[in-house]
Amino acid sequence: MSEPLPPPMPHARIAIIDLGIGNINSVEKALKSLGAEVFVQQDYALLNDATHYILPGVGSFAAASQAMVARGGAAALNNLVGDKPLLGICVGMQLFARSGAEHGVNPGLGWVGGEVGLLPVPLPLPHVGWNDITPVNDCPLFFNMPAQPCFYFTHSFAFTQVPVQQAAAYCTYGHSFVAAVQAGRRYAVQFHPEKSQQLGLLLLRNFLQFG
């Protein structure tokens, strides 16, 4: 894809949904570096006027799930986001699943078919560092990127199964796993774009184009 990179979406107002489970400063800083208006809030009632949503997560699926349930679960988040674009990052991606098996089985949002489990690999865990991914299904997050862009990962758990049509990228660490998903206007990545230098910023900038 060689088209000129579009400018950031005008008047984008980005809400970072704070589940209280990890440091989100790097996500906020990366978005602000792109010229976006960014605010962070735990109370869904104060997030209604956003144009885009970010669901970050650092830590365990169990803690993220419990924090989400305490805020009304999938129904409350569906009501908040509606048809606006949303990007899940790391554990935020894992929450798209039906359930996760970290520290017991806990419910996810059910936006993507499949569950989250420990990576079944003969390699050290967590999977930490830079790795190439292979985008599929023409996911617009990867507009204007190389065929196999490289991003920064740090995780031990991942989707164990994803319907082919909802997969947006794959990565290999001992074996192939889903590194990004798409469900309508809701997107998610297992890696950390905010820590992935220029390609990470490009991914976030692409997300800001979704009006």
Where are these regions (language model features)?
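Extreme N-terminal starter segment of soluble prokaryotic enzymes
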Residues: M9-A15
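Cysteine-nucleophile active-site neighborhood
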Residues: G59-W130
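Short acidic/histidine-rich motifs immediately flanking catalytic phosphotransfer sites
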Residues: L47-G57
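Amide-donor transfer/coupling interface in amidating biosynthetic enzymes
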Residues: E3-P7, E115-G211
